[in-house]
């Protein structure tokens, strides 16, 4: 497939679910066309908002996930709009969509129909439960996928209710898998001249993130949950400006525990000799009430007087697995991310201000990832894309009058 992604045209018909898949192609230089209805992508109505002011161009998730794309507005409920969409796909390499299974088929826009016009077309469908099976037609959300996949249960701790991780983790996992699957299918289409349908289900993508929960049940008959506060040597601890995460020992690994003891000794931590005892190698003791309270009493007396950055720097010197629990402000100031130029600031002419975005999720040797243009306004590039598709000016005007498409007025 080579390294020049600019040869690919991607039609992105996603909303709250799926936009990151197409964004990953946009970042590598592909021509990504974000297709939405004239009423606008539902993601435009999702906060948080730029300077806390809601608006169709002020949704921060929309601005991030659709940066690098061009905007095209079409009404698929309109017969002429469906023909326009079909024409658009006839010149595309990849269609990424997150429609309810059966919706496009009912409009005469099934993969079978679209691939008749373009045998090389790859269509990637990203849905909550996949395109087949008893749940395929059910409505779903990130929350329902996280619940059904087991992710919520695993995130909780014994004796407490399930816990939802922040943001839409099921969606993001599915989008990453969809990008990989799409790239593989594109590679195949370039070799064989024949595209294929890629079916990605959020519930399956998130089930891949359950660590060894399935093995616990298979091998030991146990339903695993989060560790919670069971071991002070492997949990969160408060410090002067927040929290740190510590893993001082795993299993019976004394070689992992010894550096932690040396750290406590070197710092002159009050009662540190309590840690210089092989009973801490015993998992049962570490997770006992005595082990937990003793560890937290001694260690947190030390951590509460120091910053998380200081604890991180000192702990790393002793080869102890300790790290700050970062908030958004910490991430923006993180020197590692700054060195790798992860944060990308770009002026948004619609909002009249600079906006800082997360940057490349990967680095290549010669292929440079790019943030690209600002996320499009509704119908911002409709006219120019129709011209590229071969529509003459009078026909474009007619489509606009009919309401089959919408174009931003200049």
UniProtKB/Swiss-Prot annotation:
Induction: Induced by toluene. The keyword Heme does not apply. Pathway: Xenobiotic degradation; toluene degradation. Its EC number is 2.8.3.15. InterPro entries: CoA-transferase_III_domain, CoA-Trfase_fam_III, CoA-Trfase_III_dom3_sf, CoA-Trfase_III_dom_1_sf. GO terms for molecular function: succinyl-CoA:(R)-benzylsuccinate CoA-transferase activity. Keywords: Aromatic hydrocarbons catabolism, Transferase. GO terms for biological process: toluene catabolic process. It is an enzyme of class 2 (transferase). It catalyses: (R)-2-benzylsuccinate + succinyl-CoA = (R)-2-benzylsuccinyl-CoA + succinate. Inhibited by (S)-benzylsuccinyl-CoA. It comes from the Bacteria. The keyword Transferase applies. Belongs to the CoA-transferase III family. Heterotetramer composed of 2 BbsE subunits and 2 BbsF subunits. Catalyzes the reversible conversion of (R)-2-benzylsuccinate to (R)-2-benzylsuccinyl-CoA. Inactive with (S)-benzylsuccinate. This is Succinyl-CoA:(R)-benzylsuccinate CoA-transferase subunit BbsE. The gene is bbsE.
């Amino acid at each position: 497939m080579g390294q020049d992604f600019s040869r690919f045209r991607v039609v992105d018909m996603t909303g709250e679910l799926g936009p990151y898949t197409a964004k990953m192609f946009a970042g590598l230089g592909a021509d990504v066309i974000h297709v939405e209805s004239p009423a606008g992508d539902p993601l435009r109505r999702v906060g948080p908002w730029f300077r806390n002011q809601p608006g169709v161009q002020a949704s921060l998730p929309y601005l991030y996930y659709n940066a690098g794309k061009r905007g095209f507005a079409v009404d698929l409920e309109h017969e002429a709009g469906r023909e326009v969409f079909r024409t658009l796909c006839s010149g595309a390499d990849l269609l990424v969509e997150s429609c309810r299974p059966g919706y496009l088929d009912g409009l005469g826009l099934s993969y079978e129909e679209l691939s008749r016009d373009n045998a090389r077309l790859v269509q990637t469908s990203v849905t909550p439960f996949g395109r087949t099976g008893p749940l395929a037609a059910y409505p779903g959300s990130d929350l329902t996928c996280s619940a059904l996949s087991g992710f919520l249960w695993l995130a909780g701790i014994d004796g407490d209710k399930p816990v939802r991780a922040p943001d839409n983790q099921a969606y993001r996992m599915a989008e990453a898998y969809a990008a990989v699957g799409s790239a593989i299918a594109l590679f195949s289409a370039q070799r064989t001249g024949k595209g294929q349908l890629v079916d990605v289900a959020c519930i399956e993508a998130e089930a891949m993130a359950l660590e060894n929960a399935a093995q616990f049940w298979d091998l030991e008959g146990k339903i695993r949950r989060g560790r919670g506060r069971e071991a002070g040597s492997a949990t969160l601890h408060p410090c002067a400006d927040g929290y740190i995460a510590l893993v001082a020992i795993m299993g019976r690994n004394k070689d992992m525990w010894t550096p932690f003891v040396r750290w406590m000794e070197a710092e002159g931590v009050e009662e540190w000799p309590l840690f210089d005892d092989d009973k801490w190698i015993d998992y049962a003791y570490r997770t006992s009430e005595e082990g937990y309270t003793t560890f937290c009493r001694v260690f947190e007396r030390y951590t509460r007087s120091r910053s998380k950055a200081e604890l991180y720097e000192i702990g790393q010197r002793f080869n102890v697995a300790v790290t700050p629990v970062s908030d958004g402000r910490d991430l923006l100031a993180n020197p590692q991310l700054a060195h790798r130029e992860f944060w990308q600031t770009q002026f948004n002419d619609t909002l009249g201000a600079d906006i800082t975005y997360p940057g490349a999720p990967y680095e290549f040797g010669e292929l440079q990832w790019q943030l690209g243009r600002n996320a499009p306004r509704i119908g911002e590039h409709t006219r120019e894309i129709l011209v590229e598709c071969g529509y003459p000016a009078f026909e474009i005007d007619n489509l606009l009058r009919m309401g089959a498409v919408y174009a931003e007025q200049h």
